[in-house]
Amino acid sequence: MRVIASSIRKGNVIEQDGKLYVVLTAENIHPGKGTPVSQIEMRRISDGVKISERYKTTDQVERATIEDHNFTFLYEDGDGFHFMNAETYDQVQVPKDIVGSAAPYLQENMVVKLSLHDMVPVAITLPQRVTLEVVETEPVTKGQTASSSYKPAVLSNGVRTGVPPHVAVGTRVVVMTEDGSYVERAKD
């Protein structure tokens, strides 16, 4: 489907020169003089090469048709990450470069959204929040009230984050998958 360059957003998949690219950043620039342009940074899906393109905001760009499906994470091996479609029981392997920074948050049997182009995975979307256990942090300080200061902690997936002073080792906490920030103590 052809669209104007100014309508391209992060996460869109563009087809250019017979290759697919996932958009990492898209910014519309309106200089004081001259023609407005769309600055688009994207990654080629086939080999992970990043490129940056400038289009006039009125230029036509081919946006690829993408289908989103729910998949269950099964396991990781040397070849990549393996997921199963809950409806059809089809299994698909996703390369490590597509999973990227989402890898530490994947848990067995977690339901994620995979974006597919011609049944080839091009992007992954995790749930917004995930529950993890604190495996390393400073000891709890008695008498310290809840304050806005956080102490460093390491979670069971190896991610470092800040937690409130009352959180101890072994406590299960909810964190945002986007940036690893603490949300709350788990209610389970």
UniProtKB/Swiss-Prot annotation:
GO terms for molecular function: translation elongation factor activity. It is found in: Cytoplasm. One of its GO terms (biological process) is peptide biosynthetic process. Disulfide bonds: none annotated. SUPFAM superfamilies: Nucleic acid-binding proteins, Translation proteins SH3-like domain. Keywords: Cytoplasm, Elongation factor, Protein biosynthesis. Pathway: Protein biosynthesis; polypeptide chain elongation. Pfam families: EFP, EFP_N, Elong-fact-P_C. The keyword Zinc does not apply. Involved in peptide bond synthesis. Stimulates efficient translation and peptide-bond synthesis on native or reconstituted 70S ribosomes in vitro. Probably functions indirectly by altering the affinity of the ribosome for aminoacyl-tRNA, thus increasing their reactivity as acceptors for peptidyl transferase. Belongs to the elongation factor P family. NCBIfam families: efp (TIGR00038), PRK00529.1 (NF001810). This is Elongation factor P. It comes from Nitrobacter winogradskyi (strain ATCC 25391 / DSM 10237 / CIP 104748 / NCIMB 11846 / Nb-255).
